[in-house]
């Protein structure tokens, strides 16, 4: 899963990609091609 600052290009990668909001984060999920998964707003690990 990619951590992106902007999901603008991620949601247009595949026709089946959907934008979902869960727990204050925004996810792009794609069931037909899971390599297009992405998330915006994740905390960085230090």
Swiss-Prot record:
PROSITE patterns (alphabetical): RIBOSOMAL_L36
Organism field: Serratia proteamaculans (strain 568)
Top-level taxon of the source organism: Bacteria
Stretches of the chain forming a coiled coil according to its record: none
Gene Ontology biological process: translation
Any Pfam family: Ribosomal_L36
Protein family according to the UniProt entry: Belongs to the bacterial ribosomal protein bL36 family.
Cysteine disulfide partners in this protein: none
GO cellular component: ribonucleoprotein complex; ribosome
A molecular-function term among this protein's GO annotations: structural constituent of ribosome
PANTHER family given in the database record: 50S RIBOSOMAL PROTEIN L36 2, LARGE RIBOSOMAL SUBUNIT PROTEIN BL36B
Keyword annotations from UniProtKB, A to Z: Ribonucleoprotein, Ribosomal protein
UniProt name for this protein: Large ribosomal subunit protein bL36
InterPro entries in UniProt: Ribosomal_bL36 (IPR000473), Ribosomal_bL36_sp (IPR035977), Ribosomal_L36_bact (IPR047621)
